[in-house]
Each structure stands twice: as structure tokens, then as C-alpha cells.
Amino acid sequence: MMLERIEAIERITGVLEDELVICNLGFPSRELYSIRDSPRHFYMLGSMGMASSIGLGLALSQERRVVVLDGDGSILMNLGGLVTAAAQSPGNLIIVLLDNRCYATTGSQCTYADVIDLGAVAESMGFNVIRFADDLNFEQALAMDGPVFAHVPVKPGNADVPVIDLDAEEIIERFIKEVRGATED
């Protein structure tokens, strides 16, 4: 049975240890924050379509594994970001496509994800692709060589969660401190 997006986020982050997480804007970030807040999580508050590009830059800047929680609408807005990530081929990057086939944050308008196989697109670019169906065993993605593209179909809709009560400066300052602390060891 297809998971709610918040359930998928909970299962994915539940098996992470010290990985850095970049989360797509809007409800995905709010859902992650409500499940498990951490200085290792960068909550996007704007810049739709840029989560994977930010994750790529972070992955290239240090050795720690980077997990990007992105949506189909966001990825479709910036396919060039996937091309660049594949060309740079960082072994520590996992892009998770939480595919609900809509722009849930802006009113659930349909995307073209139901007619375009984004996993096949990512594979054609050079990603190691894993597709999850009913069983989201994210340890499988963590065991793969990167860059990894993990396709996770989820139900449309948003969980009823509060807004993030951190301002943008707090989010970035604590995230930078976390990244710098790991790279200075």
C-alpha cells in the first residue's frame, strides 16, 4: 500500500545516522521538522526546484553522506540540476524522489510525473536508481554507491503539521555549524 509522504519521510530519516538532509520546501520540510528536528536537517523555505542542486553542492564540499528529500514537481522544475549531479557523480549523494504526482505545497496541481518515468530519466543520466513500492527499506539505498536516485511513490496530500518555528537565520546557522563541525574533526 502506498505511503503518505510523512510516513515515507519518517521511515527514511528513522534509519539515518549522521547524514545531512536537504528537504524540499513547504509541507515536506514541515513534515520532517514535526517528525524529527535536527541541526543536520536543512529545511528549504523557498527556491522551489533547488533542493537537489543545494544537495549536490553540499555533497561536493565534504565527505559526509547527503540525502535530499525532493518532490516530483521540484525535480521537474530543475532537470538541469539532475544532469549536473550525474555529471559530477558524487558518491555521497542520495536524491530521494517523494513522488506524489502533484505540486502539493501550492494546491495539488498535477505534474507530468505520471507520464514521465523520472527513475528512467535519472538512470539515463548515470544515477544508480532504486525503486521502492510498498516496502520502503531505505537501508538498501544507503548501501548503494552514489550518486543514488531513490524513487518513492507517495499518496498526494499534506499532513496536518504546524509551520516550522525556526527562522531562516536559525536554520542556516545551526546547519552550517553542524557541517563545519563534521569537517573540522
UniProtKB/Swiss-Prot annotation:
Family matches, as Gene3D superfamilies: 3.40.50.970
Cofactor: binding details: Binds 1 thiamine pyrophosphate per subunit.
Pathway terms, separated by semicolons: Cofactor biosynthesis; coenzyme M biosynthesis; sulfoacetaldehyde from phosphoenolpyruvate and sulfite: step 4/4
UniProt keyword terms in alphabetical order: Coenzyme M biosynthesis, Decarboxylase, Lyase, Thiamine pyrophosphate
Reactions it catalyzes: 3-sulfopyruvate + H(+) = sulfoacetaldehyde + CO2
Enzyme class (EC, first level): lyase
GO biological process, one term: coenzyme M biosynthetic process
Cell inner membrane recorded as keyword: no
Enzyme nomenclature, EC number: 4.1.1.79
Cofactor or coenzyme needed: thiamine diphosphate
Pfam families linked to this entry: TPP_enzyme_C
A molecular function (GO) term: sulfopyruvate decarboxylase activity
Domain of life: Archaea
Coiled coil region boundaries: none
InterPro entries linked: Sulfopyruvate_deCO2ase_bsu, THDP-binding, TPP_dependent_decarboxylase, TPP_enzyme_TPP-bd
Record's subunit section: Heterododecamer composed of 6 subunits alpha and 6 subunits beta.
Family stated for the protein in its record: Belongs to the TPP enzyme family.
PANTHER family associated with the record: SULFOPYRUVATE DECARBOXYLASE, SULFOPYRUVATE DECARBOXYLASE SUBUNIT ALPHA
Role: Involved in the biosynthesis of the coenzyme M (2-mercaptoethanesulfonic acid). Catalyzes the decarboxylation of sulfopyruvate to sulfoacetaldehyde.
Name recorded for this polypeptide: Sulfopyruvate decarboxylase subunit beta
Species name: Methanothermobacter thermautotrophicus (strain ATCC 29096 / DSM 1053 / JCM 10044 / NBRC 100330 / Delta H) (Methanobacterium thermoautotrophicum)
Name of encoding gene: comE
